[in-house]
């Protein structure tokens, strides 16, 4: 089970998957405020949807204009925030970017759009959502800002075995494939 396979964690949306596929890299972690010692649980998610359909603007499938014109969604998305706790509603920020801003390297895997960076050993970026933007319900975001810069050490992987190998992925044997490269991960940095 604890078998690292970085190829399964890399960008894989090619061929028909690039027109009808998505990938996401989800991170959930706790941070401790150095002054108050309060512990909070944060999350950062990088996702890509239908990259072959991308244009110079993000196409949001839930937006009425795009629905009317029959356009399929295609975008990069950063979602970040803090989970709610008793007496605190938490925060979820989502920012969408065009596929034209994506830069990807495969070996080692590295992805960047705008100032948001993802690699096997570092995640960093920022989101700043104004009240005006947050009023658009189709964007599904709160208003606020969030900045993160974290070193990532993936200690335990969850290898899903042969059913998610290159052959079964290529022939679309399953509707989706999952690989947990860092089901136990240590983070160090600032939020």
What do these predicted regions represent?
Residues 1-191:
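Targeting-peptide/extracellular-domain and disordered-appendage signature
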